[in-house]
Amino acid sequence: PNVERVFLMDGDAIVMRTEQLLQILEKLYAAFPKLQKVTTYAGPRSTLSKTPEELRALREAGLTRAYLGVESGSDAVLQAIQKGCTAAEMLQAGQNLVAAGIDLWAIVILGLTGQGGDWEEHVLSTAGIINKMKPRHLSAMTFAPAAGTPLGEDVLAGRFQVCTPDQILEECHLLLEHLDVDPLHFTSNHASNYLPLKGGLP
């Protein structure tokens, strides 16, 4: 089979025992001789549960990239969305992945404070954590309420007002202005975004 890329499903494969992941990677590369990349989502807490040696072992075994849902660099926002970690813990998780040689793709979400929140603090804190984390890739998505979630219920009840497209674009502009990672591949071409962007920074 001419398989060159494999994505380990689903939401957070890093949470598996390192021994299991190493066995999976070994079998993947044995089964697919042309395999070049194995990628996965990585949760901050599960990443922090791995020692630096474990993360390096995963990289050496062929785990090439990890997607980390940073969402925000603001502790207030992370608490509001029940992310389950602090900004400092998120930063450490990202830095550990980078230090292990794993290609880090960070993901942030615009509009998480709504119309009445401190959106500038959210954006500037997010730019700050990304600048310290130094991922090679960054994607900005836009908050979209989901039915059955606490924030989705707040939207339906009128307690949370979703940002307008103009406000989201203003957030994206401010984020781009304050990013200082060289080089950085930036995208905002997810279906949730109002303006698709893709390019290299600086």
Where in the sequence are the language-model features?
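Short glycine/proline- and charge-enriched loop/turn segments
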Residues: 152-159
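Residue-level marker for beta-strand->alpha-helix junctions and adjacent short loops that shape enzyme
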Residues: 13, 45, 73, 111-113, ...
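Radical SAM enzyme core and accessory elements
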Residues: 193-202
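Alpha-helix N-cap and loop-to-helix initiation/capping positions
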Residues: 16, 20, 53, 81-89, ...
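Conserved SAM/AdoMet-binding glycine-rich loop
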Residues: 2-99, 104, 180
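Conserved C-terminal portion of the radical SAM core fold
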Residues: 65, 88-150, 165-189
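Short, well-ordered secondary-structure micro-motifs
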Residues: 50-51, 79-81, 116-118, 150-152, ...
